């Protein structure tokens, strides 16, 4: 029995009250590996205490007691000595703010796998309110923060400065890394030690915002930036319009970082009860250098900030540098046939295909008139789509929907739709006639959406749109906005643009859309939720692309980075670069081609055909792997190198390019990174042109050795004298193996006992009423062709005796929360591997989110290795639940919904299958044709095999 006297009772109550007070005054915002700590006293000022790696509860308590505090969102006018985040002019003319905490709310965003924390502030005198919002992702180490501003004053309040966020960075030897550039020279890396004074990075283009500078930065906290060591804070403003990043360094101990919309000439008149939401600033932190910071941005992008971020991107040919405006039906058909013959998967017809009254013969005509030029394409788009289908590839098309020419039917009909200053003449740009449509006008927004709707409704087989934007807002004024709100144009344009994008993406979620804006003018996280990829630069010169793509990779993943093989001499730089080098550079992003194939030799086509086949092998690693930058071209050491490593660390792709050409130049040996030290990797060179293989071809090395030493890369190619030149490049594919230490050859491995948990795709019993007369994976023509049997055959090549057992547990999908042990327990005995391939039959998606975790946890206890695939039928909500389960339990996640989009992988009514007795029968039921055919089954098996 515990006896509590009055003194003890007083002490316990005091401790409880103090604990409650501390809890009420402090807010912890966490991702899996990072943490932001705030002090939010009721009636007081919100303050930042800590941002960095995730720490313990004990440390949090100590931080709260000892940390130096900085205002979490500094406002103007009441004594704050540095740059402020928010300044306003109240309805009565007062310029000051004094914000105090009035509440804190936390909400679990289950569908997004995130937590939203809102700190509510109110001015101490005026009915003026600010919400500071923090969205912490639970499957990625990113915290997004923004503000929501409103008031209840009688008249509008003018917002004069309205940053999204403020972050104090402790002074020391802090370096800033950011990107600058120009057309055809985007993404140039700039690094500098922060000095006293004001550093400003801003954009005023109005339409594009990532050509001359970028709205993303990194702060290296331990001195000169290192790629794979050191503490780094990354920040990315998720906005498509004009922005301003400020770093104010005064006499105190902090660099004051503020980011948000560029307020210059964009002051905003906020009406009563209107909510002004600033764009989000995404923050991440890594103690593994700049590459570590990049890996966190890339993972977050693929999961949440890039449309269809888990879907492999197709290999395409774009017509632009091949024919420019000289488009015709026969030429397009020939280009489609050529790329199909080389193994490509998509053809994109670029500018020049449209215009009736004003044919698009150059860039002076027809923007806005999105009708086919029948003189160029007498069969219309349908003929091109039919030809693409004939060649076995998909078809895409170019649009510039935000623009018009004064020589267009659209302009003649709606001159009031363009951006034009009141009482001023029209100002044109590109081609002498190009103008920008005013997207603040809802009618213009409707027109753009209708343009895409008409195109997609008429031609639903269109697979890809290249969305271009080749002009700035060079005349400040709107014919739609009122005279009092002319300063809203730059903000309202991008609100309108986002509204257009949101509507289009909602209607066509699977349509691939590329963000192009005179090249890399729209590489930002404001637009990428609506776009699948971006055109990195109009400059396709391979040597310069190394620098452009290197810089871009700091914030954006390879899956979104359009990288094309183009002609030599290059059309932008006139530089002659050998095809091997051009291929090796393009293969480090989303591979494509921008060339006229009929001008290529048969030898060149064969080299490209081989490269495309090689890229299909490494595509999962490049597009979904973790980046490690190894040797920077900006360090001027004569070479550049980076690599991608699969999340499971069982595969990697290593790139090396010689960037400078001097006689007797000694190039550094490059250490690799990211490989598992205890694993062994077999080395295979891709795109080889040398007459002899590399000395390490086919050899295996430990990850520890490669991380510590790398390999000696020859700086020249052994080729015929007539083919020798100053360029050299290598692409190495590394696969995990079990080595024989005696002769460096791969031993045969012991057999595996694999259990595949699935549904009808895994195995379906004989069922006459649906005309399924077999007992294997549904829609496979024969037992040996379903994915389980194909997987067993693949594994048995170097693991003789392997047995793959299929188990249909569709019952679990339809009856979540049932007993897992009674359902599968007896089948899990002595299993080495369990493959979870489920989800298509799930109806209760909310229950699925928790029960898939339960299933994974059970399987982890039963087998040495567990892998999990996504769904064959695409469902983003289910896919997120599966990805979350994989991340939480450290499983290998295998996406497979791309199979049906990249390949014609379902049977058709009329196809022949075989029953359990080997007799043929004809498919008649829609239920069966929803399942993968033999080809689809093989792709599923291959995807799992690559992991196992």
Tell me what each language-model feature is.
Residues 747-755, 762-849:
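Conserved SGNH/GDSL esterase-like catalytic core that processes O-acyl groups on lipids
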Residues 373-380, 412-414, 418-580, 588-604:
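Active-site neighborhood of glycoside hydrolase catalytic domains
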Residues 308-450, 459, 464, 849-852:
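Aromatic-lined carbohydrate-binding/catalytic grooves of carbohydrate-active enzymes
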Residues 33, 95-101, 268-287, 727-735:
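Short Pro-Gly-centered flexible turn/kink motifs
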Residues 33, 217-219, 227, 633-677:
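Carbohydrate-binding surface patches
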Residues 660-741:
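C-terminal beta-sandwich/jelly-roll accessory domains of carbohydrate-active enzymes
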Residues 871-948:
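Catalytic His-Asp segment of secreted/periplasmic serine-dependent ester chemistry enzymes
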Residues 25-38, 44-248, 264, 680-696:
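Polysaccharide-binding surfaces and accessory modules of carbohydrate-active proteins
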